[in-house]
């Protein structure tokens, strides 16, 4: 059970309604995470702006973007974001076989060299970012642009924050 119920549009103040309208315009849905953060409307706006920026124009393919996000959410064991991003990953083209192999991607032939590097980056950023070797960084730079690498790292950081909020606030998965 959620610690705070999502703030519904009818109960929202004008600042919150404005954020909801922008999220709805850009994404077609206002997720429960956004509705729950509306309990603090001064926190809601910057988080929603970051959420929209990371879900808008991207230097990454949607497939890689969702791979990075889903791996982050799975590592954090966040039911809310895993449920949402499993569906988005499938919509982006990942199969059930890929999703089953995600936890043991290193030994899987389902993922390309580039996809495995993105997954490895998620693990390193999430656990020991200061231990990313120059060799691995060069490898990343050989097939991702600096824009793409920065975006992947930002996705890991942002969704790490969202996962912690969702876990602490016990946000329930969105209804399809």
What residues fall within each predicted segment?
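Hydrophobic alpha-helical segments
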Residues: 1-176
């Amino acid at each position: 059970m959620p610690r705070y119920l999502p703030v519904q549009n009818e109960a929202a103040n004008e600042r919150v309604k404005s954020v909801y309208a922008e999220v709805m315009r850009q994404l077609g849905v206002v997720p429960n995470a956004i509705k729950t953060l509306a309990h603090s409307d001064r926190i809601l706006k910057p988080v929603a702006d970051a959420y929209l920026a990371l879900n808008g124009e991207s230097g990454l393919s949607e497939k890689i973007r969702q791979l990075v996000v889903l791996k982050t959410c799975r590592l954090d064991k966040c039911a809310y974001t895993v449920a949402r991003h499993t569906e988005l990953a499938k919509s982006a083209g990942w199969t059930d076989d890929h999703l089953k192999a995600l936890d043991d991607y290193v030994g899987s032939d389902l993922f390309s060299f580039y996809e495995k590097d993105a997954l490895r980056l998620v693990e390193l950023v999430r656990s020991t970012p200061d231990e990313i070797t120059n060799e691995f960084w060069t490898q990343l730079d050989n097939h991702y642009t600096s824009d793409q690498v920065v975006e992947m790292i930002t996705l890991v950081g942002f969704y790490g924050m969202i996962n912690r909020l969702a876990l602490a606030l016990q946000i329930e998965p969105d209804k399809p």
